[in-house]
Amino acid sequence: MPSNQTIISIAAATLLLVSHAAVAQDQVVKIGISGPLSGANAFAGKDNENGVRLAVEELNAKKMTIGGKTVRFEILSEDDQGDPKAGVIVAQKLTDAGVRFVLGPYNSGVAIPASRIYNDAGIIMSTVGTNPKVTQGGYKNVFRIVASDNQVGSSMAAYAARQLKVKTVGVIDDRTAFGQGVAAEFSKQAKASGLKVAGHEFTSEKATDFAAILTALKAKKVDAIFFGGYAPQGAPMARQMRQLGLKDVKLLGGDTLCSPEMAKLGGDAVGENVLCAQGGAILEKQANGPAFQKRYKERFKRAPDVYAASFYDQTMFIAQAMKASNSIDPSVVGIAMHNSSYKGVVGAYAYDAAGNMKQSAVTVYTFKNGAPVALASY
């Protein structure tokens, strides 16, 4: 007759086997994240990662099933440093790791070369890279999850002409794919709106001294300066504008300036003198926006930055398409995404054949008390 200890041991072993069998029934779907997790734009990369992570945690808690098996999402996050060469290495690394979906890159200059690798591997890439070239490669599984430079740059120019009554503008870009693209679109719309573009100066994404180019634009008596670049350069530029007597000249920019980091780095030099245009509607005015902000802050102990909500939404859209197509195969899921739409916390998502959003709101912000404040949404 078996002892009580033997019976307990057999029961424990049986429970362990059942547990392993349950795990074996899981389908693991690896989601890659590519973004700048080090360097000046690490704040943006981490914010984007947090948006994906929050979505994945919520999806795993729901235990979604595909083909009768529970789907378990795993995140593989890599630092592409905001550098095109590093981004290509990250793309190959994520491909080799068996990733099926990639959220990122953040930078257009990284997204453009990386998209070829992801496409060749049949991986869906969802990026906030706004340069129009990102979706011009003819890759069916590339999705731009926000407005493009065409919309962002032109919206800022139109606002400057109509609302700010600007007459003469200067333009500066940092020579990155993003900076050049958004500056070109701003200049095009500025001229179409009757503004005089008095000069176009250049800097780099690592520069800290802008005195020479700001002085050149000051001599041309500009009412505003549009900067195609990132917050780590935009903030010191705002400070130096004040130091050079340009305190009444507006500093305008694209989505990369619409971050609390801009005010954090620029201090009191960043206020209502700085305006930026960002793809997406006003989050706090969306039906589920405040609830998302609350969950994000509870989880990460900080407020969401520019694109956390967009990455959260796209992750949820991918899951919806998986469920609708009853597949985890990116080639099948991609078709389902092109043929459907998703209502997210920051807007509605539907894509054209090239992977651009069919409709995307653009919101113009300024800064008050160290935080971005929405002025208008189009």
Predicted regions, residues:
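Expand to "…catalyze enediolate/carbanion chemistry for C-C bond making/breaking, isomerization
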Residues: 15
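Extracytosolic ligand-binding ectodomains
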Residues: 2-12, 24-378
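N-terminal signal peptide c-region/cleavage motif recognized by signal peptidases
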Residues: 18-21
